[in-house]
Every structure is written in structure tokens, then in C-alpha cells.
Design a protein with these regions (language model features):
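C-terminal-biased regions
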Residues: 1-79
């Protein structure tokens, strides 16, 4: 889970860059801090739904975040 928290600020910046003038960044950070992973996942999936708006490493970072969430969630379910 630590890796997810380390990557969250990077994802927040990507979201902020694509949603200027909104509270999207704050909402994403809030979701991560409070463990609202369904909300965080929905925001990232929304960004990935329009990949033509993403630049450089952004798409790969968003996908990496989703993969890490899936791994962490499956570990928590097994426990």
C-alpha cells in the first residue's frame, strides 16, 4: 500500500493538469487519504477513457496506479 501512497501525488498532478479550475485534485487526494479506492479508481479510469488528452508518461503512470490498487485490494481480500 505504501507504493500507492507514494504514487498518489504524481497522479494528483496529472489530474490537476487536465482538470484546471476544478477540485478534482483535492477530491482525488481526499479519496486516497480516506481509503475511498472506488472513487480514486473511477477518477483514474475517467482519465484513461480519453487517452488522447494524456502526454508522455501520464498514461503509463495512471495504469501503474490502477494495477497497484488491484494488487493491494486482492491482498487485503485474502487476509
Amino acid at each position: 500500500m505504501q507504493v500507492v501512497y507514494e504514487l498518489a501525488p504524481v497522479i494528483a498532478e496529472i489530474i490537476s493538469a487536465h482538470c484546471p479550475g476544478t477540485r478534482a485534485r483535492e477530491e482525488f487526494v481526499h479519496a486516497c487519504i480516506h481509503g475511498e479506492w472506488n472513487d480514486a479508481t473511477a477518477m483514474v479510469e475517467g482519465m484513461l477513457a480519453e487517452p488522447w488528452h494524456l502526454r508522455g508518461y501520464q498514461e503509463s503512470r495512471l495504469r501503474e496506479f490502477l494495477e497497484l490498487l488491484q494488487v493491494d485490494q486482492s491482498v487485503l481480500v485474502r487476509q
